[in-house]
A protein has these predicted regions:
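Bimodal feature
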Residues: 9, 20, 30, 121-128
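Secondary-structure edge/capping motif, primarily at the C-terminal ends of alpha-helices
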Residues: 21-28, 56-60, 83, 87-91
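C-terminal peripheral helix-coil segments that are non-catalytic and often amphipathic
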Residues: 89-139
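Charge-rich, acidic-biased intrinsically disordered regions
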Residues: 59-77, 126-136
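Hydrophobic alpha-helical connector segments
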Residues: 1-19
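Residue-level recognition of alpha-helical structural elements
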Residues: 1-3, 30, 34, 65-69, ...
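Amphipathic alpha-helical packing segments from all-alpha helical-bundle domains
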Residues: 34-59, 70-85, 102-113
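Amphipathic alpha-helical segments used for helix-helix packing
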Residues: 15-36, 50-55
Length: 139
C-alpha cells in the first residue's frame, strides 16, 4: 500500500506538469536544457523504480538476479515516463484520478510475473486499493 501511495503522489505531480510528458521528443529537440533535465529525471525514476522493485520483490529474492531486477525497474520507469502520452493516444476519456490510478496499477503490474503464487494476491490487493481510492474521489 505504501508503494501505491508513493506512486500516486508521484503521478499526481507528473499529471500537474503533464505538458512536459505529452510531447517529450519535440520539447527536448526545441529546448536542449529540457533535454538534460529529462535525462536526469529519467535517471532518478530508474533509481526509484529499482528501489521499488527491490522492495516489492524481496519475498522472491530477485536481488539474486540483478539483470532481471534492472529489466523490471526499466519497464516501470518507461511506464512512468510515457503513461500520460499513452493515455492521450488511446483517447479514452478518463478523470485525472482514473488516469493516475491506472498508471500506478500498470507500473506495479510489472512486478507481478515474478511473484509466483503470490501474483493473484498482489493483483487483488492492488485492485482493492485502486477501488478504495477511486471511491473516495468520486463526486
Amino acid at each position: 500500500e505504501r508503494s501505491w501511495l508513493f506512486l500516486t503522489v508521484l503521478m499526481q505531480a507528473m499529471y500537474q506538469h503533464r505538458f512536459l510528458y505529452l510531447n517529450q521528443s519535440d520539447l527536448m529537440q526545441r529546448y536542449p536544457e529540457i533535454d538534460r533535465g529529462m535525462t536526469r529525471l529519467l535517471s532518478l525514476k530508474r533509481q526509484t523504480t529499482n528501489q521499488l522493485a527491490t522492495t516489492l520483490l524481496a519475498s522472491v529474492d530477485i536481488s539474486a538476479h540483478p539483470q532481471r531486477l534492472d529489466k523490471v525497474a526499466d519497464s516501470m520507469a518507461i511506464t512512468l515516463m510515457y503513461w500520460l502520452s499513452f493515455e492521450q493516444l488511446t483517447g479514452s476519456p478518463q478523470t485525472p484520478q482514473q488516469t493516475i490510478h491506472r498508471a500506478v496499477l500498470q507500473v506495479l503490474s510489472h512486478c507481478a510475473p515474478y511473484l509466483g503464487e503470490q501474483q493473484t494476491d498482489f493483483y487483488r490487493e492492488c485492485e482493492l486499493i485502486d477501488a478504495r481510492l477511486l471511491d473516495t474521489h468520486s463526486p
